[in-house]
Amino acid sequence: MRSRTPKVLHPLCGRPMIDYVLDAAIAATGTRPLVVYSPATDAVRTHVAERADTALQDVPRGTGDALRAALDALTDDVVEVLVLSGDVPLVQADLLAALLEARALDHAAISLISVDALDPTGLGRVVRTEGGTVERIVEDKDASDDERQITEINAGLYAIDGAWLRRRIGSLRPSAATGELYLTDLVALAREDGRLVAGLDVDDDGRLTGINDRTQLARAEWDMRVELNDRWMRAGVTMQDPSTVYLEHSVQLAEDVTLEPNVILRGRTVAGRGTRIGAGSRIIDTVIGEDCTVIASVLESSTVEDQVTIGPFSHLRPGAHVGRRSEVGNYAEIKNSRLGEHVRQHHMSYLGDAELGDDTNVGAGTITANYDGVRKHKTVIGKGVFLGVDTMLRAPVTLGDGSKTGAGAVVTRDVPAGKLALGMPARIREIRKPDDAPAPEAAPAADGADGADGADGPA
């Protein structure tokens, strides 16, 4: 893999590949798995700790030695051992159940899964007797020319009689070529003991291919994604171009959700009935309600209630909560803020550490200046507030219900309910009603003097 990350922790559709193997093992056996790790892969032990027991293989000396380490960690009452590879994430529980059943029916010492491979190059061949029973497994480098013509290969999945395995694991001998102990040599030992080795031959559908490099990882993820997308479409989700839709297994989608091309949904994202996710959207750990529209936007760890429109080019950062029927438009950013119902933030503004009441309008260019260089401060905006374009709200600050700000206002102190804030810094004024008489025009101020209304900057 050419990576500092242990191979089995590389992700497929949002989960480390070993998680899928553990899922299959638990579903097939109903027991807690045991994972063998080495000192170089201690991250594997940490990752699986909640779901599996672990055993340390001090010095990696091959698959047979790994199985020995596992046996040392198992109790004596274990009567059957199912051996899986952590790098075969597409393995299915029903296949493992069939493997266990095959051993039980034949009273075999070992049952194994083999595959008729289209290209067996580099893989261990399954050699059978004239009667069709498994005689031995020969590695590619040790195979004769005739044996290399065999297309039946060992898939590396085994069910083994526990009592027999304990007696014979010590009989494994190091390979002359590598010095390693091969698990596959157990097949020959079983035949020496006159025990049957059952082979379960399956078609090569790609599910049992081990992952050893990034190319194989990408192919496995593609196969998994095709299956996942097909499952959601059969459940009532529309995908206009499934080949460009990327979903992780933890995502939940309701009926009549529509996903346009080039959509990425990750983590614990949820989309409610009738919601449409537009092309180019990237959504992570976000709950979206019903009948929403998201257009070419990024949403992270946020909550979006019903009938909300987001985008294009909006960014909801962690902690954003957008109320029903609200509208968040182009180049609008929200972080750790709660918007009430029917809030309009249509263009080019930033709301951080803020709380907005229902029916508030956020003018273009509005910014909550929430950071003083040391701490974040909160902005509270009431119901029915109208924020003029280019309003700067220096937190901490509160704007009461029904208040307004003029264009370019820099609000540095609280604005009472129903009042108007004008200027830089803003001064508080009464809101003039449409039927009020206009105020007399002020005389122009001298250069360098305050405006005619006594406020700094433009009057």
Whereabouts are the PLM-identified features?
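Catalytic cores of nucleotide-enabled group-transfer and carboxylate-activating enzymes in metabolic
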Residues: 22, 30-32, 47, 71-72, ...
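Structural beta-sheet core signal
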Residues: 35, 82-83, 110-113, 199
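Conserved alpha/beta core of the MobA/IspD/sugar-nucleotide pyrophosphorylase nucleotidyltransferase superfamily
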Residues: 151-254
